[in-house]
Amino acid sequence: EPYVTYPVKSATVYDLDQVRTMESGPVWYETESLGVGSLQISNGCPCFCSFCAESWERKPYRERSLSMLAKGLRSAKAQQGLDTVSLFSFNFNTHTDLYPMILSFYREIANVSLKSQRFDLLSTDRFLVEVQQVIGKTTVSCGMEGISERLRRSLHKNLNEEQIYKACEFLFERGIRELKIFLICTGLEQSEDFGEFGNFVKRLGDLKCMADSNVRIIFSLTPLYYPPHTPLQFHECLTALEDKKKIGREVERICKFHDMEFRESASYEEIWLTQLLAMGDRRLTPALIRSSLTDGFVYYNTVPKQILRNWRTYFMELGLSEGNYLRAKGKDDIFPWDDIDLGISKKFLWEEYGRSIHFTEREYCLGR
């Protein structure tokens, strides 16, 4: 529109204490969610993981103060009848007031639910595991992402094997019941990466035995997604261009050989359609309308293989090439989302992309 100034700048609330958290709302009569609510403790992430949209789209990292969180919890408990509160955060263990927050909440409400956390922060703080044990948390989820240190550098994970082992040592000592480790299939895996992963899983099993732990260890593998507004927007979308099932089978073989559980969380068809819609522009609108309205496709858990075949037919009829959307891009390429300014320059994203493809990384900062 002529009256809109481009690029459109994102509306960022820099002080979370100035906005109300989710204290009230409909109380749905659903057995699983009854009495459960979320409390946002922070927004964004201080890290630079190249694959993570939240890490880039929601910068700068901001925290809600402990006093406002306590006030919000009491209000939410009264208005929604909560007995369980989930700490809503991309990585809850980055919060400055983590310990006083958890312990004060535990005195206010029956259950405090904590989601995924970072291995590196866990590895430097044995007390964090003890606090989680006090509040009854026996299931822990952490992102390892790349199966080797080389691939984790590409993903800018800032995580080495010794940190993972140390974190797992703390967890096993405290008798956790389940550990879920998230992995990412990058499409860049080579024989040395599989070898390193095999050694890691064996050593993890040995650590479990030495700790006399009965922990259930689950590895969950997801194909890499290349989000807009991140360094990976320039990368060739390898996991969408070709089904990397051989990589998944090898990771599964290694896990099961060492008596670990393995899961895959997304199919090739899902990542293909997700990536195409993310990289797409308005020329895909007729295909989207046809798929949804004419062919009646509604996503529910899976994307059938026939949907992928349908979309390739749409592309052919529209004179479009899926390869053009999924190819590697240069620093001067124009993206459909370039008219949206999220506060991170395209130049900086390009520089970080250069680090990623050369398997190097910079440190992140918590600003403390």
What spans do the regions from the language model cover?
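C-terminal low-complexity, glycine/proline- and small-hydrophobic-enriched intrinsically disordered tails
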Residues: 208, 242-356, 363-367
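Glycine- and acidic
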Residues: 34-36, 50-59, 82-88, 147-154, ...
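Flexible glycine/acidic-rich beta-alpha junction loops that bind and position SAM and/or redox cofactors
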Residues: 47, 96, 149-155, 184-192, ...
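Long, polar/charge-rich, low-hydrophobicity segments
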Residues: 198, 202, 206-210, 233-245, ...
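Terminal amphipathic helices with adjacent charged low-complexity linkers/tails
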Residues: 3-11, 61-65, 100-103, 109, ...
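Conserved SAM/AdoMet-binding glycine-rich loop
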Residues: 73-218, 222-226
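Acidic, low-complexity intrinsically disordered segments
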Residues: 1-67, 290, 299-305, 310-339, ...
